[in-house]
Amino acid sequence: MNNPYLFSAILLVIAVVIYISVYISKNLERTYGKEVKTAFEREGAIESEILTQEDMNHLPKPVQKFLIHVGAVGQEKVHSFRVIANGEIKMNRDSNWAKIKIEQNNFTGSELVRLFYLRMKMFGIPIYGLHSYTDKGASMVGKFAGLFTVINAKGNEMRISDTVTLLNDMCLFAPAALIDERISWEQMDDTTVNAIFKTEYCTVTATLFFNEKNELIKFTSEDRYYIDSNGSYQKVKWTTPFSDYKEINGLLLPSYGEAIWNLPDGDYSYCKFKNIESIVYNVGQ
């Protein structure tokens, strides 16, 4: 082989390697897309219904006032919702905040599903994450440059934790979903309630705090598991304050949320959502 052909062959090999690497780097995104498609197919067609006062009669007064305040009454009941948002994440207490963009699809019909896809950069290199919660279980996969797995976690602890997170999402993004019959309630006082979310696989509890404007301002739960540096799971109190209510897709919702681990040696704030680009309800209908 003479030099021109050798050079062309090398360029061809490099091009093929780059193509394969780019294709593989999108595997996690393709997996997310397939899981979302499967969830929509399993959900099937759901008849549109309007949320009325009668649908809320079993709820504690603070929750009823919250749903009225955000404008959920008179709107469609929610069976699924898609969220696109921007924020920041902190991988550990000592790291800097990194910008993230997330897209997630949640389903709250007969089958509970939460599919959360994250994009961020570290040292200028993209990192992709997929958090999957379905009837098959819960898992979290993170890939550096979309090629090298840096996080791969799954198990019952994650399923329990993600059940709490799904309940939190319903409060933050889709308050109309709080009429779900799988949620039972205990009113503690005029501005505080406990929500007990019982699924086919587990039962979790959260406490919701409201202010005098009937806004939900804080969500706490002691049923989420924190993964320490050794990879061990331990239950730790988890708090998500909400604020800056703004109109988003016809509802008055918090535009800022934060996720905080209340660890024994001090709070660890690890995630902030500052810009919710869009929320779309009942996408498959």
Regions found by a protein language model. Give the residues of each.
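Positively charged n-region of N-terminal signal peptides that target proteins for export
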Residues: M1-Y5
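Buried hydrophobic residues that stabilize the cores of well-folded domains
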Residues: V63, L67, K101-N106, Y133-G142, ...
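N-terminal cleavable signal peptides for secretion/export
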Residues: I20-E103
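N-terminal mature ectodomain segment of secretory-pathway/periplasmic proteins
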Residues: K65-F148
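Short, hydrophobic/aromatic-rich segments at coil-to-beta transitions
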Residues: K77-I84, S110-Y117, Q187-I196, I217-K218, ...
